[in-house]
Amino acid sequence: TAIRNEFKEKIESELAMGFETRPVQANTEEELEDVFAAKPAMQDVKVLDRLDDNNAGSEKRLIDAIGEGLKQSMQQHPNLILMGQDIAEYGGAFKITEGFVQEFGKERVRNTPLCESAIVGAALGLSLKGFKSMMEMQFADFVTVGFNQIVNNLAKIYYRWGQNADVVIRMPTGGGVGAGPFHSQSNEAWFVHTPGLKVVYPSTPADAKGLLIAAINDPNPVMYFEHKALYRSVSGPVPEHYYEIEIGKARLVQSGDDISIITYGAGVHWAMDYTKNHPDISIYILDLRTLLPLDYTAIKDAVKATGKVLLLHEDTLIGGIGGEIAAWIAEH
């Protein structure tokens, strides 16, 4: 009886305090600002606006540009840990981390079991302890095994508890390489309606390096999609220095007057090939580069440029990013 009375008094006391508390007045702008952690200023990294003769650098394949961005990030951040299946001695399924374990050691380049949920959870745990982490999904298809960790833990931990989820998840994605239905999916749309995540998808080697560096420097969780079919088929100039491409900023590939194509990833190369084969059509091509947050200013400019828009992506038509952008254009 004494214990019950003690708890009853405690409950009644807490209830009285709760009823005396003034109701919370929600402020939408403040709530939205709390979705992402602020990115700290960095003096030793340049933001690359565009390639020109002064900064173009040497020709590299997309896969090599990703590896270079990852290696420079490891050199820049002694607290950066890489994790994934067979990424150490073997160098990963696509050999992006080949030689990394010899240069940076097994403490920073870690093989993991075949358990994506555990890898994402370990990456988040490292972040809570002050580390940065990059985990490699061997194939983007298997992100489903780690889905709960990503959308309910990584994406929400800063908004809910003020803790950073300083994690980048690299996602080898896309079809066209004869890999079958379990190794060829384009699943970026699964994540673009999850507040707290950032989603990037480069199409060129220069953007691949710069966006990866930007993702690692960002204190928020970033889903970094890289198309497998572009790894060794696409080359381009890549600056040698350590630089970022701004997350949330699209790239104008070329101007045009007849129609605008808004696309990203492999779609950029499809659009460029179509343009070469149809020189009689003046085509405006916009490479989104970032899918969350979208660059709505650039999208608006693309619409205004021609008054006609084609949305091009590899992902499933129903529920894809193209439909969302089409709806936004219609609304505005």
List the model feature ranges, each with a label.
Residues 1-16, 32-225, 229-230, ...:
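Thiamine diphosphate
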Residues 23-27, 219, 223, 232-237:
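Proline-centered turn/helix-capping motifs that create local helix->coil transitions or kinks
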Residues 22-31, 85, 164, 280-288:
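Flexible, glycine/charged-enriched surface loops at secondary-structure junctions
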Residues 21, 77, 194, 218, ...:
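Acidic-histidine catalytic/liganding microenvironments
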